[in-house]
From Swiss-Prot:
Ranges per topology, Extracellular: 1-7
PTM statement from Swiss-Prot or TrEMBL: Phosphorylated on tyrosines following cross-linking of BCR in B-cells, high affinity IgG receptor (FCGR1) in myeloid cells, or high affinity IgE receptor (FCER1) in mast cells; which induces the recruitment of GRB2.
GO cellular component terms, A-Z: membrane raft; plasma membrane
Top-level taxon of the source organism: Eukaryota
Cited function: Involved in FCER1 (high affinity immunoglobulin epsilon receptor)-mediated signaling in mast cells. May also be involved in BCR (B-cell antigen receptor)-mediated signaling in B-cells and FCGR1 (high affinity immunoglobulin gamma Fc receptor I)-mediated signaling in myeloid cells. Couples activation of these receptors and their associated kinases with distal intracellular events through the recruitment of GRB2.
Species name: Rattus norvegicus (Rat)
Cytoplasmic membrane side: 29-204
Subcellular location(s) per record: Cell membrane
InterPro entries associated with the record: LAT2 (IPR031428)
Protein name, as recorded: Linker for activation of T-cells family member 2
Main location: membrane
UniProt membrane topology term: Single-pass type III membrane protein
Length: 204
């Protein structure tokens, strides 16, 4: 029996501990201030909304003017006439205005508020058009900046360039220095490039 009692004590202690924990958890859940506070807020809000809706319906019913039968008939007739006017306005003749500033038909009669639009000639520069006579003074043309000089060497290509005088002077300077001149545009006009360092290293 001693062995059985020794086994029952820890088991009963564990069972008691579980029971105590469950009870404490339930107490905490029920007495949580956040849950109760939220429920109270919802209850207060619902009560305020109900009170406001009742108050607004009471004020609406009190503020609503009391109408007699003739006034109600006249008001309903006005709304009926307005609906008919809107529905059947397209059936009216073309002479009657549908809008305040819009008139159907021609606009030949002058209106005090009407302003003529700017003519298209203003935008198309009609006043600056070319005169009918054949005057080419404003047209584009090639303009020579300097007077063309007569080439001394007789080449016709040098006349095409503005710096032809400089080219001729350069050719004359080459002649005076003893360099041979070749016709312009030939491949022998400039000496070929020779890599002198490579040639010297091959001989060594």
């Amino acid at each position: 029996m001693n062995a059985e009692l020794e086994l029952l004590w820890p088991l009963s202690g564990l069972l008691l501990l579980l029971l105590l924990g469950t009870t404490a958890w339930l107490c905490v859940q029920c007495s949580r201030p956040g849950v109760k506070r939220n429920e109270k807020i919802y209850e207060q809000r619902n009560q305020q909304e109900n009170e406001q809706s009742v108050a607004s319906s009471q004020t609406y019913s009190l503020a609503r003017p009391v109408r007699t039968g003739l006034q109600m008939d006249a008001a309903s007739n006005k709304s009926f006439e307005r609906k008919n006017k809107l529905l059947f306005s397209h059936l009216e003749g073309p002479e009657s205005p549908r809008y305040q500033n819009f008139y159907k038909g021609s606009r030949r009669e002058s209106d005090a508020a009407y302003v003529d639009p700017i003519p298209t000639d203003y935008y198309n520069w009609g006043c600056f058009q070319k005169p009918p006579e054949d005057n080419d003074s404003n047209s584009y043309e090639n303009v020579l900046i300097c007077k063309p000089s007569t080439p001394e060497s007789g080449t016709e290509e040098s006349e095409d360039y503005q710096n032809s005088v400089s080219i001729l002077q350069w050719r004359e300077s080459k002649r005076t220095m003893g360099a041979r001149t070749s016709p312009s545009g030939s491949p022998d006009e400039e000496p070929d490039y020779v890599n002198g360092d490579v040639a010297t290293t091959e001989k060594i």
